[in-house]
């Protein structure tokens, strides 16, 4: 049933001689853990299409009564998956590859490279490009590099359907490995190919040493992806002149940043999945302050998702006007906020979920955070279709989904976060992000290894140039009044009025939001 296979028992004469001289393969790229929605697809549509993990679990448990045969099949598949994972994790045979969210392709790569290959042999395998760029494969890939075993890595995007049954955005690579007694001091790379003809383009091929990789990714030692030789030269120059955001090898964290993913859209769905616009209205809550529901002393706050904001814009997308049947589907799309809505300082976007204020306060206490505004960014992007890959902004401090994680600064002053906002939004930072992304996920481990200017770089003259432009771009609505008040408390009325003679502090001590003017905003962003 399980087709157990032992290499040494099957090929004793090969391993008596040290292993195979040549190993070629195209191993499967599958998660070991069962994906509920995928497994039930075609078996139970209600479970397969449910977007709520809480609801899915209930539907699965109900099968015990409604469809015990399917329920028993599910339990057997679940047990098989769990035992496979247990073997991979506990056997000691796959310590480099059985890490994190288990996938079969690094397991097979580990087998081909370190377990069945002769020390003077060669291996060529087709695997996902994530073997060189993903977080959970970092130990496997860095060991290959440290032992001078990587000959070449040629990356492909499947846009021309080299593999017809694989989605176009999928990336895979041809990985060539030498045995441990056949060292390769330099490795050849070529990324972002769409067909085999592009491999003959010399400008797209470049070499990297393990020292180059360690400079760019000191924490994980996984591989940067350059389009061409020029990209490589530019990036190496940047990293030689700038530190990374958080270098774990020496403990340097110039911006004193901590990362938080407040509420996981699947695992924390119990906090918000039932709290929809229609449900809260039906329960007697009233929408006030644009997007906050209240009933007496009880309040529900918007659950902030990545699709609601963009650079210097916390009112980018809204679910206002999106019918309920389209609001909760997979990859539900928002409506873009109109120019008229952006011009209105009282306008707030409408989310699709709300979260109880008390649950949010509990999470903020865990984070030890008390400000009424926060810096959040999108951790999912698309480098082939999106104009910008690094998208983050100062937003009202609302509950944030795991797809819009938050950065908390040791120096919590508004001025400090303003400077970081300008750095994060810069073209050169975005360029470095694009080079660092191996897929759509802009994860914390990637952000930690991006080059930054330390806060000490910012002279009074630079601050005087940057700060007023970031403030004007950011403070466009009354829901960010706490941010403006914190800025005012730090710089004083005289400095505010000197920066913004056309928008001075009012008699009530509160500056008004800046008028949304597309041409003016374009000029300010060009300045920055």
Segments the model singles out, each with a brief description of its role:
Residues 2-528:
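S-adenosyl-L-methionine
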């Amino acid at each position: 049933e399980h087709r157990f296979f032992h290499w040494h028992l099957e090929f004793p004469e090969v391993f008596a001689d040290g292993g195979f001289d040549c190993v070629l393969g195209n191993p499967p790229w599958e998660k070991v853990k069962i994906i509920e929605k995928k497994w039930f697809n075609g078996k139970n549509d209600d479970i397969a299409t449910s977007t709520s993990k809480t609801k899915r679990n209930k539907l699965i448990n109900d099968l015990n009564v409604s469809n015990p045969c399917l329920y028993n099949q599910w339990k057997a598949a679940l047990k098989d998956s769990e035992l496979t994972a247990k073997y991979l994790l506990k056997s000691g045979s796959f310590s480099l590859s059985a890490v994190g969210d288990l996938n079969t392709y690094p397991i097979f790569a580990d087998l081909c490279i370190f377990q069945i290959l002769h020390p003077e042999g060669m291996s060529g395998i087709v695997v996902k490009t994530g073997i060189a760029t993903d977080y959970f494969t970092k130990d496997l890939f860095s060991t290959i590099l440290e032992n001078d075993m990587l000959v070449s890595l040629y990356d492909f995007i499947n846009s021309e359907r080299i593999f017809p049954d694989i989605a176009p955005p999928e990336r895979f690579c041809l990985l060539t490995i030498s045995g441990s007694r056949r060292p390769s001091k330099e490795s050849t790379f070529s990324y972002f190919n769409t067909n085999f003809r592009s491999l003959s383009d010399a400008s797209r091929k470049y070499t990297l040493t393990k020292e180059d990789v360690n400079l760019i990714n000191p924490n994980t030692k996984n591989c940067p992806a350059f389009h061409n030789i020029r990209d490589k030269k530019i990036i190496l120059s940047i990293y030689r002149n700038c530190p990374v955001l958080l270098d774990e090898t020496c403990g340097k964290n110039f911006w004193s940043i901590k990362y938080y993913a407040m509420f996981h859209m699947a695992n924390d769905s119990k906090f918000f999945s039932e709290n929809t616009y229609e449900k809260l209205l039906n329960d007697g809550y009233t929408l006030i302050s644009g997007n906050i529901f209240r009933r007496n002393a009880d309040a529900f706050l918007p659950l902030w998702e990545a699709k609601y904001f963009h650079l210097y814009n916390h009112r980018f997308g809204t679910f206002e006007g999106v019918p309920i049947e389209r609001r909760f589907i997979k990859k539900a799309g928002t409506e873009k906020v109109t120019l008229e809505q952006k011009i209105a300082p009282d306008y707030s976007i409408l989310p699709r979920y709300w979260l109880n204020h008390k649950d949010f306060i509990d999470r903020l206490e865990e984070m030890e955070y008390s400000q009424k505004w926060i810096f959040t960014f999108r951790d999912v992007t698309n480098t082939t279709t999106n104009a910008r890959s690094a998208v983050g902004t100062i937003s009202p401090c609302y509950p944030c989904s795991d797809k819009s994680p938050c950065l908390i600064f040791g120096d919590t002053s508004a001025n400090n976060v303003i400077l970081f906002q300008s750095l994060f939004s810069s073209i050169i930072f975005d360029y470095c992000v694009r080079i660092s992304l191996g897929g759509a996920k802009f994860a914390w481990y990637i952000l930690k290894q991006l080059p930054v200017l330390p806060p000490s770089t910012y002279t009074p003259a630079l601050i005087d140039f940057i700060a007023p432009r970031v403030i004007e771009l950011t403070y466009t609505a009354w829901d960010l009044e706490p941010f403006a008040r914190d800025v005012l408390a730090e710089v004083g009325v005289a400095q505010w009025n000197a920066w913004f003679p056309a928008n001075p502090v009012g008699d009530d001590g509160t500056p008004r939001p800046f008028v949304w003017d597309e041409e003016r905003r374009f000029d300010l962003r060009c300045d920055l």
